[in-house]
Curated annotation (Swiss-Prot):
Lineage of origin: Eukaryota, Fungi, Dikarya, Ascomycota, Pezizomycotina
EC top class, as a word: hydrolase
Binding, substrate: 168, 185, 207, 231
One annotated Gene Ontology cellular component of this protein: cytosol
Biological function: Decapping enzyme for NAD-capped RNAs: specifically hydrolyzes the nicotinamide adenine dinucleotide (NAD) cap from a subset of RNAs by removing the entire NAD moiety from the 5'-end of an NAD-capped RNA. The NAD-cap is present at the 5'-end of some RNAs and snoRNAs. In contrast to the canonical 5'-end N7 methylguanosine (m7G) cap, the NAD cap promotes mRNA decay. Also acts as a non-canonical decapping enzyme that removes the entire cap structure of m7G capped or incompletely capped RNAs.
Protein source organism: Chaetomium globosum (strain ATCC 6205 / CBS 148.51 / DSM 1962 / NBRC 6347 / NRRL 1970) (Soil fungus)
Protein name: Decapping nuclease RAI1
A GO molecular-function annotation: nuclease activity
Length: 373
C-alpha cells in the first residue's frame, strides 16, 4: 500500500505559523583529511575573508574529492548519538533522526521550482562544484586568526582543496509537534563556540554563485536563496556568505546575508516569491503525517517524482531496518534499555521514551525511513 501526502499551492500553507524550536548543538563529529570519522571538533574551520580576484578553478587538477557514490547511511550520526547517550545515561529527546539534507528538500518542496528528490549531477557540473569547495578553502583557516600564521593566510590559494574533511554539527530542533535530531556539515565559525552548551553559535555557511547582471539573474539567485536559507535555518547558522564568480571563474565579490532577515529581504525585492513560514509549516505538517504513518517496523521509502503533486510513502521491507540502523547502535540501545540504574536526576521525557524514526539522506531519487526500533 502506498500512502500519499498532498503538495498544495504555497498559499494554502499561509496563515497561522507553526512553532519552531531553536536548533541547539548537543554533539559534533569530524571527518579528517582521509574522511575518517572522529568524535571531536578537529575539522572545525574559522572564517577569514578571501582575496578578491582569485581564480576559483586554480587547483582543479589537484582537487581531492570525496567519493559520495558510497552510501554512508546514518552511521556517523548514530555513532555520535550513542556516544552522547553514553555520557548522559539516557536516549536523546527526538522523534525523528536524519541528515539536514533530507529536511532541506522537504522544506522546499512546496514551491514548483524545486523538485524534492532530484538534484544536479555532480559529473555534469564538476567545475561549479569544485569552485564552491575552492571558495571554502579560500575563506577558512584551521585555527583562530591569532593562532594562524600570516604565511598560511596569504597562501590559502595554494592549499589543496579537499572536501573529505568536514565538521558536522548535531542539533536538536523541532517543528510543530515533531522533535528532530539533525546532523549536517558546517563550513566555518565566525568567532568561537560559547562555553555554555546549547547557546547559539555564530556559524557561517559559504556559497558561490554566478555574478548578477540581469533581472533574470536576480530571479534565479533569489530562488537559490530559499535553499540557502533552509539549510542554514535548520542548523541554526546565522550568517551566509556568498562569493560571486565571473564566467571565467574569478572571485569578483563577497556578500554577507543574515539568515534571519533573508525571507523578508527576498519578498521586498518581489522577484522569486517564497515564504519562510510556508516552508516551515509544510515541513511541520509533513513530519507530523510521517510520524503517524510509520506505525510499525520494516523499511519505508519516501519519494516524490519530479514535479509530482504528492509525496509517496511505501514499505519496501516488511521486517528489519535494512542498512539504515547499524548493529552497533541497535546493540547500544538494547543495552541502554536493560540498564535500570539511571544517573541521579535523569528523567527522560515522553518524547525521549518514544521510538524515533530514522530517515537517511537518499541517492538522488529516493530516501528511506525505518519504523520504530
Amino acid at each position: 500500500m502506498t500512502l500519499q501526502f498532498p503538495i498544495q499551492a504555497p498559499a494554502r500553507y499561509a496563515g497561522e505559523t507553526e512553532p519552531v524550536k531553536r536548533p541547539r548543538e548537543f554533539a559534533c563529529f569530524s571527518y579528517d583529511k582521509d574522511h575518517k570519522f572522529r568524535l571531536d571538533d578537529s575539522s572545525m574551520k574559522w572564517y577569514y575573508p578571501p582575496e578578491i580576484g582569485t581564480n576559483l578553478s586554480h587547483g582543479y587538477d589537484t582537487f581531492i574529492k570525496h567519493d559520495d557514490s558510497v552510501d554512508e547511511h546514518l552511521d556517523s550520526l548514530l555513532k555520535t548519538i550513542a556516544d552522547h547517550e553514553q555520557q548522559t545515561g539516557g536516549p536523546i529527546d527526538a522523534h525523528i533522526v536524519t541528515w539536514r539534507g533530507m529536511l532541506t528538500k522537504v522544506g522546499g518542496s512546496d514551491a514548483s521550482f524545486l523538485s524534492l528528490w532530484f538534484e544536479m549531477n555532480a559529473t555534469l557540473y564538476r567545475l561549479t562544484f569544485t569552485s564552491g569547495y575552492k571558495f571554502e578553502t579560500l575563506s577558512t583557516i584551521p585555527r583562530p586568526w591569532g593562532e594562524t600564521t600570516r604565511d598560511y593566510i596569504e597562501n590559502r590559494d595554494n592549499e589543496v582543496t579537499n572536501n573529505k574533511e568536514q565538521y558536522c554539527s548535531v542539533v536538536r530542533t523541532g517543528f510543530g509537534k515533531s522533535i528532530v535530531c539533525l546532523g549536517g556539515e558546517v563550513d566555518a565559525i565566525w568567532d568561537a563556540k560559547p562555553e555554555t552548551p546549547g547557546k547559539p553559535i555564530n556559524w557561517v555557511e559559504l556559497k558561490t554563485t554566478a555574478e548578477i547582471h540581469t533581472h533574470n539573474d536576480r530571479f534565479k539567485f533569489d530562488r537559490k536563496l530559499m535553499r540557502y536559507w533552509i539549510q542554514s535555518f535548520l542548523l541554526g547558522v546565522p550568517k551566509i556568505i556568498v562569493g560571486y564568480r565571473t564566467q571565467d571563474g574569478i572571485l569578483s565579490g563577497v556578500e554577507e546575508f543574515s539568515t534571519l532577515s533573508m525571507p523578508q529581504d527576498v519578498q521586498r525585492r518581489k522577484t522569486a516569491k517564497w515564504d519562510g513560514n510556508v516552508c516551515i509549516k509544510f515541513a511541520s505538517l509533513f513530519l507530523d503525517w510521517l510520524r503517524q504513518s510509520i506505525n510499525d517496523g520494516g523499511v519505508w521509502r519516501i519519494r516524490r517524482e519530479n514535479k509530482s503533486d504528492h509525496i509517496e510513502l511505501f514499505k519496501v521491507e516488511e521486517v528489519g531496518h535494512g542498512s539504515i540502523i547499524t548493529d552497533e547502535f541497535m546493540n547500544w540501545r538494547i543495552k541502554l534499555s536493560l540498564n535500570k540504574d539511571k544517573p541521579p536526576g535523569f528523567e527522560p521525557s515522553d518524547a525521549a521514551d518514544a521510538e524515533p524514526s530514522m530517515a537517511e539522506e537518499p541517492v538522488p531519487e529516493t530516501a528511506s525511513a525505518s519504523g520504530a526500533y
